[in-house]
Amino acid sequence: MKKRNKGLVEQTTTEKNNFSRKTAWKVFWWVIILAVVIGVLAYIFSPRAATAVVESWKLNGGSNSTLTAKVSGFSNELTFKQINGSTYVTDTILQVSITFDGLNSPLTVTAHKTVNSNGNVIFNIANLSINQSNGQITVNSNGTMMNGGSSNNTKSIAGFETLGTFIAPDTRARDVLNGLFGLLPIIIFVVFFLLFWRSARGISAGGREEDNIFSIGKTQAKLAKSTVKFTNIAGLQEEKHELLEIVDYLKNPLKYAQMGARSPRGVILYGPPGTGKTLLAKAVAGEAGVPFFQSTGSGFEDMLVGVGAKRVRDLFNKAKKAAPCIIFIDEIDSVGSKRGRVELSSYSVVEQTLNQLLAEMDGFTSRTGVVVMAATNRLDVLDDALLRPGRFDRHIQINLPDIKEREGILKVHAENKNLSSKISLLDVAKRTPGFSGAQLENVINEATLLAVRDNRTTININDIDEAIDRVIAGPAKKSRVISDEDRKLVAYHEAGHALVGLHVHSNDEVQKITIIPRGQAGGYTLSTPKSGDLNLKRKSDLLAMIATAMGGRAAEEEIYGNLEITTGASSDFYKATNIARAMVTQLGMSKLGQVQYVPSQGTLPSNVKLYSEQTAKDIDNEINFIIEEQYKKAKTIIKSNRKELELLVEALLIAETILKSDIDFIHKNTKLPPEILLQKQEQQAKQKLNKSEVKPESETNS
């Protein structure tokens, strides 16, 4: 029922733009921070000298004098090479300067002293070593008197102590690294926690906070702005008229309040899948120009108890803030099923969510301006409390489109397609009874794909035919290897369906027969209603459908015998049995009377029966009786019209697919149509030509 239109402009587009800008600023600041960190580290690790204070030193005189100094800022990991330098000792002041230009560079220690009568004393420093046990620096030196005095003069300065300065390698880098290594476990823990927190919130996936541990209790509904209008929807005139009142209320709520009318609380759309229920809800929001919260029934539930009820509250709280607006819950049967029909293990969880939904729709809290719309394929399974007035006031059934609506839907979807002028969309609509709007859209799309595949710019009638077959039975299996005997057997089977359908009293007429394999089927026969699309079926129509379904097996048995029947009739039996069972247990069309033994599907668990064992046997016997009677009828038709059967088979073997015009010609005239005869003559001529070109080997050798 619907045109393929996105129809929703998510308001999260603005949020995504804001998120992009925020992300850009975050990236910018992270780059700045990273640059600062790199600069600090570069400063820390750059090779340079720093100053440390010599806390104390002592020079013991003698020929092998030693200089012991305790220096702050030194660490035991330092090692030094051979040290060369000079030491000057003065009478009153002893100064020590140690220069260091790198970890592995030579170290020079200089001491100076002036002696009154003897001149200067020079000491040559041989080496410098570190005593790792006490952290003191020990300098071993050899001294020589320049004025010829004895080395005992050097002992006169023993015990002299003072302070000095020490130029040493910078140890702050080493200290910073030690501190960082100490903080490393904490940093790793913080980083992992931040990563977990960000991933749990879903920030890495475009900034959306869906399906994460921190938003378990938040609604999964998407807030959007609908652009769909009623003009985008073909058909459904009565349904759209009903929904216009909702549109008017959302546009003019004061008009209803002044009249004292209670505002519509909810609308539930129900019907077969693909009929346009979701599109209608979008159209209401688009016509009213209000926000549209779209959710699914299964989106409320989660593995944790109580999450469903919390998400319902969150959804309605957001809707109240955005009022006037529409809440649309698709497949509401997953959360609104009748209470008491589920097993105890899941009952309490589902009931909590449903109870919260009931309270929000008609409870103590006001929700003026919020209209709830829902869609389901199974209205019969919904809880009665959910369907009562005050919650879902309107129940609108969305049926499969009739022939007029199908034509309109096809026109909507063919607007931007280049269809051949020979294609009549009315004829296509006649050939697609029971198709939903989604299936009709798929027919047009498949036909377009077939044209593109053949590098054509125009869609022809053959593309439409193939597209319909694809939607009904799947793509053709033309590459499947089938023997001539199996091909002939399939032709008899499908011709049997068609022949019985032509001779029974029914509202259906045979439209097409094909023996081209599709999916699991070797072929199929298509029948459509003669006049319109009847929702009501007569008993004669149902019996005719059973007889037609049994026609394939009847033809096999008539031609090949009881021992040569095949498994090709399994789907036919399934169809016939379902029709017969419905006639007996639901429709009151049997000898058991006007009683419904099986309520509407879904109202009771499958293991619960409302009848006795004897009644169950009577039901089975009556179903078997109906099917056997129609099978006998099908066999009688096959035997009485054997010639017509053979003509249908011959036409199928020649053309593989025959349409209604050819089928009706054979049925009325009991002979092949001219088009089929022409194809037969062409095939015979081709076979003769092939035989004449293939000469026996003996003739060639002679």
From Swiss-Prot:
Any single GO BP term: proteolysis
Cofactor section: Zn(2+)
Keywords, sorted A to Z: ATP-binding, Cell membrane, Hydrolase, Membrane, Metal-binding, Metalloprotease, Nucleotide-binding, Protease, Transmembrane, Transmembrane helix, Zinc
Ranges in the topological domain labelled Cytoplasmic: 1-26, 197-702
Topology with respect to the bilayer: Multi-pass membrane protein
GO molecular function, one term: ATP hydrolysis activity
This protein's name: ATP-dependent zinc metalloprotease FtsH
Lineage of producing organism: Bacteria, Bacillati, Mycoplasmatota, Mycoplasmoidales, Mycoplasmoidaceae
